[in-house]
C-alpha cells in the first residue's frame, strides 16, 4: 500500500493564495502524475514537474462542508505503453500574473514506494484514483474544468449494467442455477 504523507502547497501556491484574498478565484488547470522523488523538505520549493508520466483526469469537484473543496483525480492505463510508478502528483493552477504554476504536490512516503501503473497490455482497464481536500475560507471559488467525456450519468451506468446482465443471462447459464 502506498502512503502519501508528503503533501504541500508550494511557495508559488501560497503566493497565489494571497492573491485569492484579493478576490481572485482559484483556477486549477490540470493534474499530472510523475515518477520523480525529492527530499520531502524540498517539496514546497517545486516549480517544475519532475519526470512527468501522464495527465490525470479530473472527477467532479464537490464541497463536503463550508470552506472545503474535494478534488478527485483519476488515472487509467489506456495509453500507457511503458509501465511506471507514480511517486508524485502535481496539481497545477493559473496564477493571474505568472500563468500556470505548480500549486500543490503530493509525494509517496519513500522513494521506493508509489502506485504502480502497468501497461495497457499487461493489465487492460487498470485505473487508480486519488482524492485531495483543500480548505479555504471561500472554497466555492475553486474552478475546475471536468471533461464530460470521462464521466457517465447514473442513468447511463444503470442502463449499461442492465444490458450486461441481460447479455450474460443465457439459457445455459440459467439452467445451471436451476439445478
Where do the PLM segments sit?
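N-terminal assembly/attachment segments of tailed bacteriophage virion structural proteins
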Residues: 1-148, 174-178
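A signal for long, low-complexity, Ser/Thr/Asn-enriched, surface-exposed stalk/shaft
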Residues: 152-179
Amino acid at each position: 500500500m502506498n502512503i502519501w504523507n508528503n503533501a504541500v502547497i508550494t511557495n508559488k501556491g501560497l503566493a497565489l493564495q494571497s492573491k485569492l484574498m484579493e478576490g481572485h478565484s482559484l483556477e486549477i488547470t490540470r493534474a499530472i502524475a510523475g515518477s520523480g522523488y525529492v527530499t520531502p523538505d524540498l517539496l514546497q520549493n517545486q516549480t517544475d514537474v519532475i519526470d512527468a508520466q501522464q495527465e490525470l483526469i479530473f472527477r467532479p469537484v464537490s464541497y463536503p462542508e463550508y470552506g472545503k473543496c474535494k478534488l478527485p483525480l483519476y488515472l487509467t492505463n489506456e495509453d500507457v505503453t511503458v509501465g511506471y510508478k507514480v511517486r508524485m502528483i502535481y496539481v497545477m493552477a493559473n496564477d493571474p500574473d505568472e500563468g500556470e504554476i505548480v500549486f500543490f504536490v503530493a509525494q509517496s512516503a519513500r522513494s521506493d514506494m508509489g502506485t504502480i501503473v502497468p501497461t495497457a497490455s499487461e493489465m487492460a482497464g487498470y485505473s487508480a484514483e486519488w482524492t485531495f481536500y483543500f480548505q479555504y475560507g471561500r472554497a466555492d471559488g475553486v474552478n475546475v474544468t471536468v471533461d464530460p467525456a470521462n464521466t457517465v450519468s447514473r442513468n447511463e451506468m444503470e442502463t449499461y449494467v442492465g444490458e450486461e446482465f441481460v447479455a450474460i443471462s443465457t439459457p445455459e447459464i440459467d439452467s445451471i442455477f436451476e439445478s
